[in-house]
Amino acid sequence: MRLPQDIIIKPYITEKSNMEIGAGKYTFIVDVKSTKTEIKKAVEALFSVKVLQVNTMNFEGKVKRTGVHEGPRPAWKKAVVKIDTDPKPVEYLAKGGKTVTNNKKYKTSIEEFGVAQ
C-alpha cells in the first residue's frame, strides 16, 4: 500500500482546470502506476472530500534535443477528480430494521488546491 502523498504529486492548474473548479472538478498530476481507486482513496484521505468520479489520461514523454543529444522526457498521468459539492448524510438499515445515519463531515471544496472558488 502506497501513501496518498506518493500517489498525488501536484495540482495541475490551467485555464480549463480553473473553469472546472466551479463544477467540483479538480485536476492533479498523479503517479503513472496509480489506478483510479487508489487516486480516489488518496484524494479522500488528503482533502477530506467525497469523490464521485475519477477520469485519468496517460501522456507519453516527448523526445527533446540539446544540440546533437536526444533524450526523452518522462511519461506522466493526469487525473480529473469530481467531488461531491453537496454531501448528504448516508442512511442505511441496521439490525432490527432501525435506520442509522452516518454523519461524517465532508468538505465541499479543496482549499489547498491553490485557487478559491
Curated annotation (Swiss-Prot):
GO terms for biological process: translation. Belongs to the universal ribosomal protein uL23 family. GO terms for molecular function: rRNA binding; structural constituent of ribosome. PANTHER family: 60S RIBOSOMAL PROTEIN L23A. Part of the 50S ribosomal subunit. Contacts protein L29, and trigger factor when it is bound to the ribosome. Pfam families: Ribosomal_L23. The keyword Transferase does not apply. This is Large ribosomal subunit protein uL23. GO terms for cellular component: ribonucleoprotein complex; ribosome. HAMAP family: Ribosomal_uL23_B. One of the early assembly proteins it binds 23S rRNA. One of the proteins that surrounds the polypeptide exit tunnel on the outside of the ribosome. Forms the main docking site for trigger factor binding to the ribosome. It comes from the Bacteria. Keywords: Ribonucleoprotein, Ribosomal protein, RNA-binding, rRNA-binding. The keyword Hydrolase does not apply. The gene is rplW.
